């Protein structure tokens, strides 16, 4: 049956079929991802981008073609992730430009629009490289243009252009040595061909649900050869944001970004631009880009950690949020994956421990006119993390702040419901925070290293939570009062009486006072005695000491607890900035894990 035109309804179905085909193949795309960085997330990034489009177009299946293509372009820009996702976003921007005059199109009109889309894709990159998705896009579009001159049938034209795209894909190893050495084709190019195959299948069958299993054509040996080390990257942070402004000059924007990193991709319009870059200083990047407009939807991934996940032999991933306080070397050693909390000073937005350091945070806390606010990681951040990990691990345990204190647990749970690991997945309420969550996470991480089975790990988590307590002493009550958790009247009374509150987490997960010490002198010596008295003669396995830029008392406490409990494992860590919002400068916490 001849298909003579493409309208909004058909375009909706075509997109759905094509996107579903790629979603089915995202794990494979992650495995063959070696360029520009072997961080194993091309499939995840393309899938995340396309899922965002699908969610946005669901209510709009009966719009005219030009109206629907505008919605697709906007959704692609908002949801683009990674180098490949931002290139796709600019492709859909260009396609929308080409389809703007039409409620429906012929093969030749669609081919003309595809050329604009491909041209726009090239403009997104400062240094376009052949042997990538760009080569596949160009071959597909050129073939569409040629075939549409001789046939008005979309089915016939699509078949010819798919063959051209596949040929270009198979040639990518000849264009990029890194692909040839790894024995793979370009991952993003393969993703685009997968979309085309899904569309072709839909045209042939008329049924979106009948998607064939795609033969990748590569052996397991080839997949193993993609495990390239990325520990020594000059620009290790894959960094993205959206800039909203009045008249964003893309040429000037790209020149501004050029000294700050590589793999620069810019998509969007004069009023809304999505930028992608690999950099060594995300905070400096966001601050620099603010001259062009409001910087929104900040995202930063450490590609070194992603690469370690690709190479990891572990079968179970452990995820925490950034309120879990552990020293960086412990997080790295045990491959603990961190989803950062967000915080802001007025309109200035930051990613906890990524785009703001502890020193920077406490400096702003002292001098900013705005008291900072925190917000839990959005479900999209968790979803992207889980999607990536599901390609490299069989199971996941995600450990988070108490449900009664934050929406972090709920957001993680909502995201995990949309991602399926091969074997097991669960969200655990730590019923603790900071160093308390840290000692629980460390217990689980060490058990994962020893190949403990998933059911036993869940039981171990429950047992460790039951045996963990955290005590927190505040140097001042200023931050807790400014954050709205203590009234001005109560603060004045406590200060007048010379009381020092000691806080802990109840068995239900609430943060409440559990005692006081008296007198403003030697606060932390008194706190030390308070905690030792609480511990009494109990056997302690692990101690986590955390502080808000107050290292000297923290170090003294480390010596005290190592002496009092010589068999215990003791670590010292900073309070994360997100907790510093409420605890303030100088706060000290002591987490105890009992045997």
What are these regions (language model features)?
Residues 281-298:
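Charge-rich, low-aromatic oligomerization/scaffolding segments with amphipathic character
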Residues 45-72, 355-390:
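Glycine-rich oxoanion-binding loops at beta->alpha junctions
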Residues 271-280:
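A generic structural motif
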Residues 9-12, 16, 20, 24-25, ...:
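Acidic, glycine-enriched active-site microenvironments
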């Amino acid at each position: 049956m001849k298909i003579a035109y493409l309208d909004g309804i058909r375009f909706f179905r075509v997109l759905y079929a094509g996107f579903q085909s790629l979603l089915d193949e995202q794990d494979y795309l992650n495995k063959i991802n070696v360029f520009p960085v072997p961080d194993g997330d091309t499939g995840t990034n393309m899938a995340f981008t396309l899922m965002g489009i699908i969610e946005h177009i669901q209510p709009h299946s009966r719009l005219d073609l030009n109206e629907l293509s505008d919605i697709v372009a906007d959704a692609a820009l908002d949801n683009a992730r990674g180098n490949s996702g931002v290139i796709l976003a600019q492709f859909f921007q260009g396609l929308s430009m080409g389809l703007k005059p039409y409620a429906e199109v012929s093969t030749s009109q669609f081919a003309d629009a595809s050329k604009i889309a491909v041209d726009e894709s090239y403009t997104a990159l400062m240094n376009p490289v052949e042997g990538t998705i760009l080569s596949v896009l160009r071959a597909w579009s050129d073939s569409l243009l040629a075939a549409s001159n001789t046939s008005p049938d979309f089915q016939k034209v699509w078949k010819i252009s798919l063959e051209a795209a596949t040929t270009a894909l198979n040639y990518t190893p000849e264009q990029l040595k890194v692909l040839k050495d790894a024995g793979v084709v370009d991952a993003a190019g393969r993703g685009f061909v997968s979309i085309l195959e899904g569309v072709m299948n839909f045209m042939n069958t008329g049924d979106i649900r009948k998607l064939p299993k795609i033969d990748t054509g590569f052996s397991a040996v080839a997949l193993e050869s993609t495990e390239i080390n990325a520990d020594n990257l000059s620009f290790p942070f894959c960094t993205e944001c959206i800039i909203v402004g009045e008249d964003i000059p893309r040429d000037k924007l790209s020149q501004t970004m050029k000294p700050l990193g590589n793999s620069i991709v810019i998509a969007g319009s004069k009023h809304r631009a999505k930028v992608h870059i690999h950099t060594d200083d995300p905070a400096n990047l966001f601050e620099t880009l603010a001259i062009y407009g409001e910087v929104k939807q900040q995202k930063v991934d450490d590609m070194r950690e992603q690469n370690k996940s690709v190479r990891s032999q572990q079968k179970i991933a452990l995820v925490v949020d950034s309120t879990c306080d552990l020293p960086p070397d412990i997080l790295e050693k045990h491959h603990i994956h961190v989803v950062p909390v967000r915080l802001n000073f007025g309109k200035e937005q930051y990613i906890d421990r990524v785009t703001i350091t502890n020193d920077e945070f406490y400096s702003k806390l002292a001098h900013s006119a705005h008291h900072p606010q925190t917000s839990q990681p959005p479900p999209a951040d968790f979803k992207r993390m889980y999607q990536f990990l599901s390609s490299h691990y069989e199971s996941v345990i995600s450990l988070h702040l108490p449900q009664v204190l934050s929406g972090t647990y709920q957001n993680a749970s909502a995201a995990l419901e949309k991602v399926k690991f091969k074997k097991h997945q669960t969200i655990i309420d730590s019923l603790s925070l900071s160093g308390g969550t840290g000692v629980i996470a460390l217990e689980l991480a060490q058990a994962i290293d020893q190949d403990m089975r998933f059911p036993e790990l869940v039981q171990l988590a429950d047992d460790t939570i039951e045996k963990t307590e955290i005590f927190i002493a505040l140097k001042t009550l200023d931050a807790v009062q400014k954050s709205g958790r203590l009234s001005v009247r109560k603060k004045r009374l406590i200060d007048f009486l010379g009381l020092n509150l000691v806080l802990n987490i109840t068995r239900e997960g609430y943060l409440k006072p559990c005692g006081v010490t008296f007198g403003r002198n030697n606060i932390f010596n008194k706190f030390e005695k308070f905690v030792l008295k609480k511990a009494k003669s109990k056997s302690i396995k692990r101690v986590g000491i955390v502080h808000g830029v107050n290292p000297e008392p923290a170090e003294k406490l480390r010596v005290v607890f190592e002496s009092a409990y010589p068999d215990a494992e003791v670590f010292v860590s900073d309070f994360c900035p997100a907790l510093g919002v409420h605890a303030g400068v100088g706060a000290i916490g002591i987490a105890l894990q009992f045997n």
